[in-house]
Amino acid sequence: MQWQDEAIILGVKRHGETSVIAEVMTPSRGRHLGMVRSGRSRTMQPVLQAGNRVDVIWRARLHDHLGEFRIEPLQLRAGQLMETATAVYGVQAMGALLRLLPERDPHPHLYQALDVILDNLHDPVDAGELFVRFELAVLNDLGFGLDLSECAATGLRSDLIYVSPKTGRAVCRTAGAPYAARMLALPAFLGEGQSKAADPESLAAAFRLTDHFLHRHVYDPRGLNENAARDGFVQAALKALERKAEPPALDKAV
């Protein structure tokens, strides 16, 4: 058995004295594991850092075997991903999200999204919004997608400001008003056709939205704890956006 694909490194584990088990995300094979011989060598260690894009050849006697990876670098961006807190936490948090999906289950659009986000994690302002959309995409692929296109009660497609915490469907201002205290906020930047950028308040609301449904549908039913990297990422992204929103300091007169 053999296949070749490009991949993004999600992480590695030691295997014996010199080898590692590498975990990668591929466009056509999904999340996949494989042994890398001499993976702890000085040559391979920089290549096998999380976030790097690589070329992978997988070989095994049978399809369900662990198999071996032969890996060549395509884009080494791990160094850049260590420059900001959002990038450091973000690459770990996205890896944890992808581990919620079955191994070897292809999700090509998630691979493409991961690749784009990794190229933009160095910009802490954009990183938060991209990460929220990634969480929504993972929820959708797990079968728990949110419907933010129209009001669940009236069918209206405008003035959508709430999300039902039970159904994950959008609710308009009028229909949701009597239940506002129990509703989740729908940030404007997540609405269909919206081009408005996130501000600190709306980004915080978006993080609360995805956190609620990840716990409701995934973490709690599976008895899982939320990955600590997400908390670090959320805090770093909000701080970065708050700094951007601050008015520029006036130069003191000489």
Swiss-Prot record:
Belongs to the RecO family. This is DNA repair protein RecO. The gene is recO. One of its GO terms (cellular component) is bacterial nucleoid. Keywords: DNA damage, DNA recombination, DNA repair. It holds the Pfam family RecO_N. NCBIfam families: reco (TIGR00613). PANTHER family: DNA REPAIR PROTEIN RECO. It comes from Agrobacterium fabrum (strain C58 / ATCC 33970) (Agrobacterium tumefaciens (strain C58)).
